[in-house]
From Swiss-Prot:
Keyword Iron: yes
Membrane topology (UniProt): Peripheral membrane protein
Source organism of the structure: Archaeoglobus fulgidus (strain ATCC 49558 / DSM 4304 / JCM 9628 / NBRC 100126 / VC-16)
Residues reported to bind [4Fe-4S] cluster 2: C53, C143, C146, C157
Subunit structure comment from the entry: Probably composed of three subunits: TtrA, TtrB and TtrC.
Protein name according to UniProt: Tetrathionate reductase subunit B
Role summary: Part of a membrane-bound tetrathionate reductase that catalyzes the reduction of tetrathionate to thiosulfate. TtrB is probably involved in transfer of electrons from TtrC to TtrA.
Keywords annotated in UniProt: 4Fe-4S, Cell membrane, Electron transport, Iron, Iron-sulfur, Membrane, Metal-binding, Repeat, Signal, Transport
């Protein structure tokens, strides 16, 4: 049972990077795709992921592409990392009036800054609160899973996690298959029909 919910705010100051602005694409083989898995039992709220994301993607201070929520449940505290779920049926894509938000064949949901008019329709449509209007660019912004780093490197949040609470890889990867097969993997807000492709394990009573 969910007792309380508190957002953990983490402010990163004077961290500047332009690494996350590319539109890089890579080719998948045999219909494989990338997925993101979070093991809540391994997260203790250190926020290394939040800081790494901000540095890698030049996220404005006070805004977040990834964040960590703290829940008190059944006498224990659970830290739950949140990001864009890169859904298979993304409501944000359907809501965009100019087709600036799109889904790639690799499974990512991305935003074309050159097309986005900053109307906010996609922000309102996202059931996960994963989008915001970038105050510098004036366009919608969100997690890209550091697509400019893949496949040579992992997303910054995954690479920086000291407990390996975040896992990112192809569905065919051994590590991903093992986690999804041995643990009770769930998605958030499945009832929305968005078909999210971010999976959580060791999670109970959190949306």
């Amino acid at each position: 049972m969910l007792i309380s919910k508190t957002l953990i705010f983490y402010q990163v100051v004077n961290i500047v990077s332009q690494k996350g602005s590319g539109k890089r694409r890579w080719k998948m083989e045999n219909g494989d795709r990338y997925v993101y898995v979070v093991d809540v039992s391994k997260c203790y709220g250190c926020l290394s992921c939040v800081a790494a994301c901000a540095a890698e993607n030049n996220v404005p201070v006070g805004y977040f592409r990834t964040w960590v929520e703290r829940y008190a449940m059944n006498g224990r505290v659970a830290f739950v990392p949140k990001i864009c779920n890169h859904c298979d049926n993304p409501s944000c894509v359907h809501a965009c009036p100019v087709n600036a938000t799109y889904k790639t064949e690799e499974g990512l949901v991305l935003i074309d800054d050159e097309i986005c008019i900053g109307c906010g329709a996609c922000i309102q449509a996202c059931p996960y609160g994963a989008r915001f209007r970038n105050p510098v660019k004036g366009t919608a912004d969100k997690c890209t899973l550091c697509n400019h780093r893949i496949p040579e490197r992992l997303p910054a949040c995954v690479e920086s996690c000291p407990t390996s609470a975040r896992v990112y890889g192809k569905m065919s990867d051994k590590a991903v298959k093992e986690i999804l097969s041995k643990k009770n993997a769930v998605v958030l807000k499945a009832y929305t029909g968005n078909e999210p492709h971010t999976y959580y394990v060791s999670l109970t009573g959190v949306e």
